[in-house]
């Protein structure tokens, strides 16, 4: 299913991190003291590796990010939909993966790398903007935090950044939607102009495979507007 937006190219989507100018058990075994009992049935729990992952193949190597689709469903759905070419936008033809070939247009050492702008100018985007989705459990508390770049409230589009370090001053201002699980060394090696050669989405586990990004976007269409 294709998510349809009636949109025009945004006049303003500078997305320059408004707040950034302020400078980013093991289990024990207890011996039985009575008659041996049959073990009780265990509840099935999800594998800790289950989830939705963004695999960003760059010219410097691979970055793997676990996307927080349960806590930031709308933001993750937007990223996934664009990455898989399912969201209609003004930058690329329908069906084409949005992020493939886009460069990291802004890099601040010991702070963050920023990409997702098809024009590489810092003002480009998909032709629409959507509301901030700030979850209290998702904070800029560690290196490898993936968060939305914006030009103020409700101006999210396609630009995102990944941090080199903890950046708590961005909490509440930028929507966190994932964390790097592999490839932080690649994040740290990226310089301005390095390219996202391919961005793919990997779903691991039953819940992740059943999650429908396009349905999430359809359910939240009132939070999107043309730009």
Annotate each predicted stretch with a short phrase:
Residues 1-8, 146:
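Bacterial N-terminal signal peptides that target proteins for export
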Residues 6-18:
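Bacterial N-terminal signal peptides
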Residues 20-227:
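Cyclophilin-like peptidyl-prolyl cis-trans isomerases
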């Amino acid at each position: 299913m294709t998510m349809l937006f009636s949109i025009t190219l945004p006049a303003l989507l500078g997305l320059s991190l408004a707040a950034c100018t302020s400078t980013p058990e093991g289990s024990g075994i207890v011996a039985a003291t009575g008659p041996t009992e049959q073990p009780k049935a265990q509840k099935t729990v999800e594998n800790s590796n289950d989830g939705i992952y963004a695999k960003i193949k760059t010219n410097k190597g691979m970055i793997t990010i676990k996307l927080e689709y349960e806590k930031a469903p709308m933001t993750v759905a937007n990223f996934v939909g664009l990455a898989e070419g399912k969201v209609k936008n003004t930058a690329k033809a329908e069906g084409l993966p949005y992020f493939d070939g886009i460069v990291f247009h802004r890099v601040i050492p010991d702070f963050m790398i920023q990409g997702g702008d098809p024009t590489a100018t810092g003002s480009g985007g998909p032709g629409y903007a959507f509301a901030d989705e700030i979850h209290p459990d998702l904070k800029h508390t560690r290196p490898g935090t993936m968060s939305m770049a914006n030009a103020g409230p409700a101006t999210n589009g396609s630009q995102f950044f990944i941090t080199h370090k903890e950046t708590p001053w961005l909490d509440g201002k930028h929507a966190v939607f994932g964390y790097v699980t592999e490839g932080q060394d690649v994040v740290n090696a990226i310089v301005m102009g390095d390219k996202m050669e391919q961005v793919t989405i990997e779903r691991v586990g039953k819940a992740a495979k059943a999650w429908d990004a396009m349905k999430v976007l359809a359910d939240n269409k009132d939070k999107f507007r043309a730009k």
